[in-house]
């Protein structure tokens, strides 16, 4: 299969899982999974409940370590130690479906929560954070301060705009890889469109993303490649440019019915 559009010749993937399995007692959630995300690539992750999507993503996030024999590589370097702290220190950020924003706080405070900018004296640099928030909203979200001011309370924003804040926050802190955990759940059609535009922007600024969603109609238009998981195994990997949505839906249906691509 040809290299995906997001790949860069000669560059190792941002993250790569090789032969990763994960068991919990007698239950095997992942079995021999090979998975990678290249720089400037958006990778979709599809599969029914129980297919292994959540476990795979939690391995990438550092919540789970692979069973013996599985390996994780970051920019081509094998990771002998893997944890949430390690993954985050390398620039792996997650945008959850709940968005993890403080509704009663202003936009600028949400963008810098836990990583506040400070003056040389160690005081909170409120003016700088407001100015940076305005710049980020303009560059990443397409908002002018006249339309949506950084001092506006998050609760006044739409669902799609809130996802934009969460994604922009991740990008500001030099995220190499943004994990999007069903970011369109519960959103209207118009807000879903806004969110998908924010997802596309991740690639435009040179970063990568994993997009998890149950809705193929949301995933297909924005990804470069798609992994289909079934019962803990990779049932298929597709370049979007090489498969139509109708053909992909047929294959997903076949996998769900038979557990194979044959």
Where are the language model's segments positioned?
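Glycine-rich phosphate-binding loops of nucleotide-dependent enzymes
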Residues: 2-262
């Amino acid at each position: 299969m040809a290299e995906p559009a997001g790949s860069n010749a000669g560059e190792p993937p941002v993250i790569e899982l090789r032969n990763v399995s994960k068991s919990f007692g007698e239950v095997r959630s992942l079995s021999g999974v090979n998975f990678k995300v290249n720089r400037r690539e958006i990778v979709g992750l599809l599969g029914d409940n129980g297919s292994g999507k959540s476990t795979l993503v939690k391995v990438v996030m550092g919540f789970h370590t692979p069973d013996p024999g599985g390996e994780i590589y970051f920019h081509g370097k094998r990771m002998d130690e893997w944890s949430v702290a390690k993954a985050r220190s390398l620039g792996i950020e997650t945008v959850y479906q709940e968005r993890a924003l403080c509704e009663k706080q202003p936009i600028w405070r949400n963008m810098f929560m836990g990583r506040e900018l400070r003056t040389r004296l160690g005081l909170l640099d409120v003016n700088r954070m407001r100015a940076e928030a305005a710049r980020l909203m303009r560059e990443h979200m397409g908002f002018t301060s006249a339309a949506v001011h950084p001092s506006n309370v998050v609760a006044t924003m739409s669902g799609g705009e809130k996802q934009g804040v969460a994604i922009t926050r991740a990008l500001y802190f030099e995220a190499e890889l943004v994990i999007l955990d069903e970011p369109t759940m519960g959103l209207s059609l118009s807000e879903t469109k806004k969110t998908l535009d924010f997802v596309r922007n991740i690639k435009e600024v040179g970063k990568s993303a994993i997009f998890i969603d149950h809705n193929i109609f949301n995933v297909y238009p924005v990804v470069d490649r798609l992994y289909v998981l079934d019962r803990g195994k990779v049932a298929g990997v597709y370049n979007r440019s090489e498969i139509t949505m109708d053909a992909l839906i047929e294959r997903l249906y076949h996998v769900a019915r038979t557990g194979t691509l044959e």
